[in-house]
């Protein structure tokens, strides 16, 4: 937050912070809105609330900024079904908290483990970035297990979404098998 505050104060222009994964992270910059009049925070209902298909999010900023934006708002930019879904989800937002907490707990369980053949980024989202020089082997194991992951082969990493407890067990099985294969290959 200190860096964001410095940026806001150093530049006389809008500063937009994307907090798409805010529900999974311990920090938010919302507390800066009172002292940084040029700060705009965007959020989405796609990640923690499961409305990716609805393509809906929202903006948090000062009242003065909102009034200025309203004059430039495109009418009907969000369809009525997405709007209704957003209203329902936001009215029941607290009901999502246990699931969000489960995802955080299971994500942190992955991150707490140490492996010789790969590493995790320090994720504050609902996914893990896994890096290994043998990414092709790891991707093949995920594929054999029927798990779909996002590949960034050129950079030797992949992205795995924290799913249900069962899906996370399958991910763990793949990671354990990969670790075992890599350990055996080194001997």
Language model regions located:
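Alpha-helical scaffolding segments of alpha/beta enzyme cores, especially the outer helices
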Residues: 2-6, 31, 105, 109, ...
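PLP-dependent aminotransferase class I/II
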Residues: 38-113, 118-121
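Conserved PLP-binding catalytic core of the aspartate aminotransferase-like
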Residues: 104, 108, 112-145, 158, ...
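Short loop segments at secondary-structure junctions
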Residues: 12, 61-65, 91-92, 132-135, ...
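Active-site pre-lysine segment of PLP-dependent enzymes
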Residues: 1-48, 65
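Short acidic/glycine-enriched loop/turn segments that link adjacent beta-strands
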Residues: 53, 124, 154-156
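PLP-dependent enzyme catalytic core of the Aspartate aminotransferase-like
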Residues: 2, 141-145, 150, 154-187
């Amino acid at each position: 937050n200190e860096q964001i505050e410095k940026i806001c104060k150093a530049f006389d222009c809008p500063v937009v912070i994307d907090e798409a994964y805010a529900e999974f992270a311990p920090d938010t910059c919302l507390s800066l809105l009172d002292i940084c009049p040029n700060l705009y925070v965007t959020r989405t209902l796609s990640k923690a609330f499961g409305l990716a298909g609805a393509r809906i999010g929202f903006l948090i900023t000062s009242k003065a900024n909102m009034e200025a934006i309203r004059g430039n708002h495109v009418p009907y930019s969000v369809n009525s079904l997405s709007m209704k879904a957003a209203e329902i989800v936001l009215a029941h937002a607290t009901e999502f908290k246990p699931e969000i907490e489960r995802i955080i707990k299971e994500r942190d369980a992955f991150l707490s483990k140490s492996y010789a053949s790969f590493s995790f980024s320090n994720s504050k989202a609902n996914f893990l970035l896994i890096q290994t020089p043998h990414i092709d082997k790891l991707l093949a194991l995920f594929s054999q297990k029927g798990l779909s992951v996002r590949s960034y082969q050129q950079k030797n990493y992949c992205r795995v979404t924290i799913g249900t407890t069962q899906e996370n067990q399958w991910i763990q099985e793949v990671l354990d098998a990969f670790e075992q294969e890599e350990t055996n290959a080194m001997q």
